Amino acid sequence: MSYQIITDSCCDFTKAQLQQYDVTCANLTVLYNGENHSNFSEPAAVKAFYNELRSGTMATTAAANPDEWAQRMRAALEKDRDVLVLAFTSALSTTYQSAVIAAADLREQYPLRKIIVVDTLCAALGQGLLLHYACKKRDEGMEIEELAAWLEEHKSHVCHWVTVDDLSHLKRGGRISTTTALVGTMLNVKPIIHVDDEGRLINCAKVRGRKSAMEYLVKKFQETCTDFDTVFIAHGDCPEDAATLEAMLREKHGIKEVVTGYVGPVIGAHTGPGVLVVFFMGSKR
């Protein structure tokens, strides 16, 4: 095709997946132990990151800046290719706005090229799932403007249902109080979080125990899923729980493909180890 799809590393695709989909990627970064780390979800590196969190290491995150975006865009523009950007939700990061700034500058330098930036309103492998569909449409021959319109129409149907195992990280991020974290831990309370239509993380329920939390995720899948061809599952270094969740989903539905990966460091820094997420296309978020 005559255009290049570019995303950012919050999509949590591995380098191999990015190559498979022919997508280039702007990097967000995570700071811990005094060093900046790019947010690529290579399994060994992400597992090491979660082990750092378990040992008490604090991590902070930084958005992809305009220069990072411009570098990726310019590489395509110099090959006379248009650019379609799928960016991490603007509700959680300035990464999208940085892409908009970079695109505005480059349009002046490359007036004959199209540069379209989409705020996915998605995060982690939810962003990855939307990217999966975008690449499929591209490969089927959809032109850049038509694909951008398709993304705007369908992005609010990418469902993200999350359960967090360790409340201490939500406490550190200010999403729950110290008292709530303490009582919740004592009572084995597991919060349920989802990404709403504005791309925000919303606390929406509390259940007792990990099994009940996974059953809640399956319930939301049953209520709203509209496409059983492809489902993504992500985890914070708890592959056994991810496999259990997949089995629970497959028990009730004829899902063709389940893609499992890590919740990368940008989101994982805030949710901690043990986070578990299911992503799918649904009738509503």
What are these regions (language model features)?
Residues 4, 10-18, 23-24, 29, ...:
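Mixed-charge interfacial surface used for oligomerization/domain docking
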Residues 54-85, 89-92, 97-102, 148:
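Glycine-rich phosphate- or other oxyanion-binding loops that anchor nucleotides, phosphorylated ligands
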Residues 87, 116-117:
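A glycine-rich beta-strand to alpha-helix segment
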Residues 4-64, 68:
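N-terminal glycine-rich anion-binding loop in soluble enzyme alpha/beta folds
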Residues 3, 81-85, 231:
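Generic beta-sheet signal
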